[in-house]
């Protein structure tokens, strides 16, 4: 896909990091603290402390797989690539069956990222966020991996239900050497295919970490699918689980 600079629109698919960002149960709260200010000290400096699998972040295989690749070992060509966006807003939240995406699986090219759009970013910071997103089920995940995708992403907190204790879907993806992008936003602004840039922090031997995800959209491709009216979602607490 070739995009001219004069026609490109950059869509920020990452949430802000701050002390109020939603967390899985049991995760220590973040601490973003300014310890020097321009008025008092002549310069500003801050301290950031947070768990690496919070906010918009990327899972490396080492997150769930003993001996799996760490984040700094993943080729950048797998993180700066193209994405195929599956609009799942007409599908019930939860695992997406293969038959729900079968009409588009043939569009997948080797090294694409598969992104699942639920419009769930509108629920960020509410109890509904932990129940109202879509992610590929086991059969769909295997089919996408067989097509050669480099990873998967979605506008929700995990590749598995938040109360999972087996992490089956994490293990399918990470066991195949793929990456997982969690807590994305603004996927509703993306067309069916676009360029994608995933820029994680370069931390040695990281099992995952914060990531800035930018979609590069050719204006000729349109502005994405307009938001559906909000689906009714049941509020729920967020029990612990892998993210």
Positions of predicted regions on the chain:
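Active-/binding-site microenvironments in catalytic and ligand-binding cores
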Residues: 1-243
